[in-house]
Structures are given as C-alpha cells and as structure tokens.
Amino acid sequence: MSRVCQVTGKRPAVGNNRSHALNATRRRFLPNLHTHRFWVESENRFVTLRLTAKGMRIIDKKGIDAVLAEIRARGEKI
C-alpha cells in the first residue's frame, strides 16, 4: 500500500540528513499516516481511510460527507 494520504494527497518527500560536519546523506520524509475508520451517517456504514493527522483535521472541519465527495470526484474508489 502506498504511503499517500487519501485526503490531502501528501506523499513521501526526499531530502538530506545533515550531520554536525554538514555531511549530506539522502533520506525520505514520510507523512504521518494513520488508518482510521469513520462512521458515515448518510451511508449507514464505516469507511476506512488512510490519512495524515492534517487530513483528520480537515475532516473535523468540513465533515466526512464533504471530504468523501471530493475523494470520489477525483475518481478514487471508497
């Protein structure tokens, strides 16, 4: 399963570790992903999403129905 947030689309980024001597070694910055079940009242069922902490805050703000509509408009199957 890919490390991508289903709400924000955030995915791993690449950069450098920097030592005290400023030596650079490549690394990946991974998103803060969680698998979370949300109760969708309109569909009378649970929906499981893989999303970041920011994605959870967006759902708290907009509501699960609005966010699911946006995800489905992108063509993602839920």
UniProtKB/Swiss-Prot annotation:
Ribonucleoprotein keyword on record: yes
Family annotation (Pfam families): Ribosomal_L28
Annotated keywords: Ribonucleoprotein, Ribosomal protein
Family annotation (InterPro entries): Ribosomal_bL28, Ribosomal_bL28/bL31-like_sf, Ribosomal_bL28_bact-type, Ribosomal_bL28_sf
GO CC entries: cytosolic large ribosomal subunit
Positions of disulphide bridges: none
Protein name: Large ribosomal subunit protein bL28
Organism name: Actinobacillus pleuropneumoniae serotype 5b (strain L20)
Gene: rpmB
